[in-house]
Each structure stands twice: as structure tokens, then as C-alpha cells.
Amino acid sequence: PKFTEIGRSTMEAKIIPSLWFDNNAKEAMNYYVSVFPNSKIKNIEYYPDEKLDEHFVGMSGKVLNGEFSLNGLDFICLDGGPIFKFNEAVSFTVTCKNQAEIGDYWSKLSHVKEAEQCGWCKDKFGISWQIIPENLGQLMAKGDKAVQVLMKQKKIIIEEFENL
């Protein structure tokens, strides 16, 4: 999107998801770039000496700003302590070409069995993912029977929709 302000030139706004980890941002970045193709860690800055500011107490050496990309999508993250927790109100959707791809991402990203439902899963860092076929809209167009199939699934099984 482009935004114009009085006295300023037109600029493009870039939206970048920001992830607040307790104290394992570097581990998470390394993990995610191993899961998704065309991914990399771009930059990591660490908290300075904790004596510089009262907010840095106990944070020296942890990630202050991590920048990484997953299959071309930029993310930023930090170690911010246990103040905030991830929940299902925000999730990332991975669209897959086929059942094999769904299975691959599911095996890498689903670590909380009780969170598995309708293609949703939660990884070991608490982030929610939706692992879905890229043609889910077509599969769901089959009506109430498709909804019933989806509601019974944890990992989506494409064949169960095709057999309706």
C-alpha cells in the first residue's frame, strides 16, 4: 500500500511480523530457517551491558533485535522476557502444493498434540501455524460434508475431501 502525507512524498509501507520470545529468539530463528526453503538469518544484535539501563538487567547477551526471512517473508524478533506469550489469536498460514508437503511441514511444526485441529498446530516455541492445501477453498466448496471432514481432522488429509 502507498500512503501520502501532506508535505511528504509517497512511500511504500512494509509490514513485518515481530515475534517476542522469552529468551530463545536465536534458537527459534535457527529452527525456522531450517524448516522453510529460501530462508536466512539476516542480522542479530544483542543487548548491551545490563548496567547501561535498568530495562537491560538480566538481558546481557540475549537477542535485542533479530532479523530473518522465511521463504522471502521478513520477520523481526527479540528476547523480551516472560511478559508476553504467543497464542492462537495470531497464526501463520503455510499453503502447500500436495499431501507430502503438508506432511513435511506438519512433522516439523507440530509439537503440541492438544493444539492440533483442522490443519492448525503449535510449534515448540508456542507459535500457531495453519498447514493447509493451496486449494482448500475448492475443497471446502463441497458444502457441509467438507466442513464435517475438516472438523474431524487434525492434519489435513486432502484425499478425504476428494472422496466426497
What is each model feature region?
Residues 1-10:
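Short, Lys/Arg-enriched N-terminal segments with co-localized hydrophobic residues
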Residues 16, 63, 116-118:
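Short loop/turn microsegments at loop-to-beta-strand junctions
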Residues 152-164:
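Terminal, contiguous helix-loop blocks that mediate binding/assembly
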